[in-house]
Amino acid sequence: CARRIWRSMAADAYTAKDLRVAPISRADADRVVRLLHYSGKVVPNSQLHLGVFLGDRLEGAMQFGPSMDKRKTLGLVRGTPWNGFLELNRMAFSDRLPRNSESRAMAVAFRMIRRAYPHIEWVVSFSDAAQCGDGAIYRAAGFLLTGIKPNNQILQLPNGSLVARVTVTK
């Protein structure tokens, strides 16, 4: 049958349309983020955890939740109620996923959010250009670039690990 042949194909034969996005547990999402995200850190107040599957394998995760600094972010879109937006806190994908997986997975996730949480009007995310580019995958998914500024909030410790400035005490 065609399905059996499709499943036996090499991973590079997959396209972004072959991805499946589905809810996963916080524990599974945290594990993927710790393993694959450049910071190795999760956002503790994330509330919605979506897995990105290629075949039966979990190859990525997206974690959504309230914005880390809601007062500053709320003003980006005039008239937004306090609970009217989410932040894509973390997105971590394995290199085994095909081209355009990020924008495809975000599009599917946004449709899921729109259906399940109709009060959510928009999603915000931040891209660290020093670590992972200039936000091109976000713009490909329909995000608007609202600003670029130097990142002075991530510090590299002498042992090479990355930490948020707010977690370091003097």
Model-derived features: positions:
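Short amphipathic alpha-helix that is part of the acyltransferase structural core
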Residues: 3-44
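A generic structural signal for short, solvent-exposed coil/turn residues
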Residues: 13, 42-44, 56, 80, ...
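A generic secondary-structure signal marking the coil-to-beta-strand transition
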Residues: 17-20, 29, 48, 58-60, ...
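Acyl-donor binding region in acyl/amide transferases
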Residues: 20-23, 47, 65-170
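Conserved beta-hairpin
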Residues: 33, 46-66
